């Protein structure tokens, strides 16, 4: 059936209140959306950040008269409160969501493919990965930068550390590209489970070891270290991340904005001979070879 969607303009401080009011007025679901296309990059621990200008969207049954709800918000927030009423046609939302995802190529050899799509090149290095939990699927520039970097390496027989493994996409890609062993580390137990499930789906579960930080091995001397997290943890955990690689090992870091790159280059330059920075949109990848 079709739906009525009511959008109310709010701020980060009032968004939760507006959400509760929409639910109280009979909304079947509520969604928050950035009203000004301003990204939220790096929340502090325990924060659930919202944009300074946030649209709160309530989804109502088609027979709902939106006028009383609009009048209610005008009474609370004033006559000039921003709002919009839309009629949404009924769709197969699952199918529409699935249609959004297509096989993606990274570098020369590597493809990331949803399970419901045909593999474009059966002779390529194909990683089967379905969007699911909020972990990497290759669509974000930082993941793409790391996948392209891995595709350009000779990983045959190598040991790879994937720090902040998320979905396991980088470690699984490394194994498919010839690595012998991957050690994946993440602070989130759901990420560990997602990595395990995806490794099984790709037939590499016996080559990947997955750890929470407290359980990670301390004597790793990897050939390749990749960390696609955020600038804050990359800064704070620099000695630990750098310590996972042996002399001459290769490292790639992402989850970094261009403005954050110079500081991290200086920090990691203590241990690595740094390569030129690779940039995709406003994100970048730092890479280098370990000294010694």
Curated annotation (Swiss-Prot):
<keyword id="KW-0963">Cytoplasm</keyword>
<keyword id="KW-0489">Methyltransferase</keyword>
<dbReference type="GO" id="GO:0032259">
    <property type="term" value="P:methylation"/>
</dbReference>
<feature type="binding site">
    <location>
        <position position="186"/>
    </location>
    <ligand>
        <name>S-adenosyl-L-methionine</name>
    </ligand>
</feature>
<feature type="binding site">
    <location>
        <position position="164"/>
    </location>
    <ligand>
        <name>S-adenosyl-L-methionine</name>
    </ligand>
</feature>
<protein>
    <recommendedName>
        <fullName>Ribosomal protein L11 methyltransferase</fullName>
        <ecNumber>2.1.1.-</ecNumber>
    </recommendedName>
</protein>
<keyword id="KW-0949">S-adenosyl-L-methionine</keyword>
<dbReference type="GO" id="GO:0005829">
    <property type="term" value="C:cytosol"/>
</dbReference>
<feature type="binding site">
    <location>
        <position position="228"/>
    </location>
    <ligand>
        <name>S-adenosyl-L-methionine</name>
    </ligand>
</feature>
<comment type="similarity">
    <text>Belongs to the methyltransferase superfamily. PrmA family.</text>
</comment>
<dbReference type="GO" id="GO:0016279">
    <property type="term" value="F:protein-lysine N-methyltransferase activity"/>
</dbReference>
<feature type="binding site">
    <location>
        <position position="143"/>
    </location>
    <ligand>
        <name>S-adenosyl-L-methionine</name>
    </ligand>
</feature>
<dbReference type="InterPro" id="IPR050078">
    <property type="entry name" value="Ribosomal_L11_MeTrfase_PrmA"/>
</dbReference>
<keyword id="KW-0808">Transferase</keyword>
<dbReference type="InterPro" id="IPR029063">
    <property type="entry name" value="SAM-dependent_MTases_sf"/>
</dbReference>
<dbReference type="Pfam" id="PF06325">
    <property type="entry name" value="PrmA"/>
</dbReference>
<comment type="function">
    <text>Methylates ribosomal protein L11.</text>
</comment>
<dbReference type="InterPro" id="IPR004498">
    <property type="entry name" value="Ribosomal_PrmA_MeTrfase"/>
</dbReference>
